[in-house]
């Protein structure tokens, strides 16, 4: 799909009027659309494909159809992805590796200015997915098995991360060594931030 460079489009649907409107077209593989958590006029989307070949994370303002690149790669084999919007809608957070499988960060880009902040973490703390608490004070991660991009041997944990300067301090919450990571845990916080919620198959086969 990535190599084909076929014409593609983003569109929105008015659920009250039942109308469809095209808002953006490109030959890139457009994918992973997410509305802002607070601004219904702002949509995040991605140029999908091999992460080391694409500047992946973009936004588009529906009222003007103006697009903005959220993170531009700065070195060979750099990857950024698994992006999500902060609860207040001001930041897009993502997994950043500079370069791939070598140096690991969780980074955030301001949706208005593009200014970035990033927190480093250890190889064994890298997670397939990260998420942010509703009060925006804590992060969580779902770990990974040795077959994932970090190739870590002791990363099969549900993690709680506390930002500390330019890095994360990690706390291990759940041992996932009996979980099969073909089912990605996809961590997130409960609305009151008292729980980290995740999927797991260590008690049996998932449906």
Task: Please provide the spans of the model-predicted regions.
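Conserved beta-propeller blade repeats
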Residues: 1, 25-46, 73-95, 123-142, ...
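Structural motif
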Residues: 5-9, 52-58, 100-108, 148-159, ...
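Multi-bladed beta-propeller domains
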Residues: 13-29, 60-79, 109-126, 161-183
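Residue-level signature of beta-propeller blades and closely related beta-rich strand-turn architectures
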Residues: 48-49, 98, 145, 202
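Short hairpin/turn module used for nucleic-acid contact or packing/dimerization
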Residues: 155, 161-207
């Amino acid at each position: 799909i990535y190599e084909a460079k076929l014409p593609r489009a983003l569109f929105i649907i008015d659920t009250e009027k039942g109308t469809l409107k095209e808002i953006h077209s490109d030959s890139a593989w457009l994918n992973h659309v997410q509305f802002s958590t607070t601004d219904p006029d702002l949509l995040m989307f991605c140029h999908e494909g091999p992460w080391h070949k694409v500047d992946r994370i973009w936004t588009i303002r529906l009222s003007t159809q103006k697009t903005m690149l959220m993170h531009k790669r700065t070195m060979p084999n750099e990857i950024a992805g698994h992006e999500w919007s902060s609860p207040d809608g001001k930041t897009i957070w993502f997994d950043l590796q500079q370069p791939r499988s070598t140096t690991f960060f969780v980074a955030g880009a301001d949706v208005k200015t593009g200014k970035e902040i990033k927190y480093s973490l250890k190889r064994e703390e890298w997670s397939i997915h990260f998420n942010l608490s509703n009060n925006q004070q804590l992060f969580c991660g779902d770990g990974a098995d040795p077959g994932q991009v970090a190739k870590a041997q002791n990363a099969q944990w549900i993690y709680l991360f506390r930002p500390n300067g330019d890095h994360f301090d990690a706390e291990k919450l759940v041992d996932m060594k009996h979980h099969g990571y073909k089912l990605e845990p996809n961590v997130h916080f409960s609305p009151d931030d008292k729980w980290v919620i995740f999927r797991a198959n260590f008690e049996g086969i998932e449906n």
